[in-house]
């Protein structure tokens, strides 16, 4: 029983960390613009697919991984500059619809370019599992967890110890006041999209050796990342990561102990529960009406 529980726990924490990275991407853009970016899932897909493409093209793995983060970050910037900035001041619903359209475009382009097939990426440090109290833990899972911890620490330092980070925080609290004290909020939005896309791509790269990837994986990963952001408290960075871990663990436990047929339904049952009973999330969002 313990071994089985640990196996489900390891699986849930691994995929939950990926949801957490996706949720961080949602949080960054939401804080900067009050927009929920439904193209976030496609950045996860893009990171994994580009990593596969670059490695198959013969590039060393470290170079392939860097490019697979850099390219989606550039795509995120282009999305902000070409689709969001021209309609600055539009209704929030309009901006959300634009991100949905961008999601469809990205998915279609990757389908045409790399096909409909499923692709794999070699694990970063081998595939020999480690035994832990009767359960098995893959080395790639440690990469996912370790990188997620590093990202959380790096973002904490960025937002609390750097001027650029503090400018982004100030904008998230009060955009008008930030502009009045001279903060370039357009630059903040620019950076938010770049960082959000990079975080999504990083999550996709990390999880691809475990779950494989294809042109359409971003839909469900993005939606579950959004669930994680809401569960943790929309606008709360640490809550986004913890929400991702919770969603991943509940999903794995439900699939293991109830039925795998309900695996994808569990996060959406959870978000309905949260919206009805805890609309600000477990750790408190910025305000209940914005959730």
List each language-model region with its residue ranges.
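Alpha-helical transmembrane segments within multi-pass membrane transporters and channels
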Residues: 26, 59-102, 109, 242-247, ...
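Alpha-helical transmembrane segments of polytopic integral membrane proteins
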Residues: 23-32, 75-76, 80-81, 102, ...
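Helix-loop-helix "hairpin" substructures at the membrane interface of multi-pass membrane proteins
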Residues: 15-16, 136-214, 232, 237-243
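Membrane-embedded helix boundary and interhelical linker motif in transport proteins
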Residues: 10, 31-78, 82, 87, ...
């Amino acid at each position: 029983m313990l071994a089985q529980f640990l196996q489900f726990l390891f699986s849930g924490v691994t995929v939950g960390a990926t949801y957490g990275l996706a949720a961080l991407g949602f949080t960054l853009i939401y804080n900067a613009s009050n927009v929920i970016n439904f193209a976030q899932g496609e950045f996860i897909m893009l990171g994994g697919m580009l990593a596969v493409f670059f490695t198959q093209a013969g590039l060393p793995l470290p170079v392939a991984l860097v490019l697979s983060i850099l390219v989606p970050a550039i795509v995120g910037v282009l999305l902000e500059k070409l689709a969001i900035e021209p309609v600055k001041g539009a209704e929030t619903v309009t901006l959300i619809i634009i991100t949905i359209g961008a999601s469809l475009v990205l998915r279609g382009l990757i389908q045409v370019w790399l096909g409909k097939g499923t692709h794999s990426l070699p694990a970063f440090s081998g595939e020999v599992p480690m035994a832990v109290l009767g359960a098995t833990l893959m080395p790639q899972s440690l990469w996912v967890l370790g990188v997620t911890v590093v990202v959380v620490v790096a973002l904490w330092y960025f937002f609390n110890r750097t001027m650029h980070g503090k400018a982004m925080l100030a904008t998230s609290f009060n955009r008008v006041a930030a502009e009045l004290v001279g903060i370039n909020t357009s630059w903040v939005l620019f950076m938010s999209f770049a960082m959000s896309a990079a975080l999504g791509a990083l999550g996709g790269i990390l999880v691809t050796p475990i779950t494989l990837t294809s042109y359409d994986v971003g839909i469900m990963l993005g939606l579950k990342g959004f669930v994680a952001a809401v569960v943790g408290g929309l606008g709360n960075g640490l809550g986004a990561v913890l929400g991702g871990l919770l969603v991943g663990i509940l999903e794995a436990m439900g699939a293991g102990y109830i039925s795998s047929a309900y695996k994808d339904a569990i996060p959406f049952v959870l978000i309905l529960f949260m919206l009805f009973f805890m609309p600000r999330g477990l750790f408190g969002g910025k305000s209940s009406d914005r959730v």
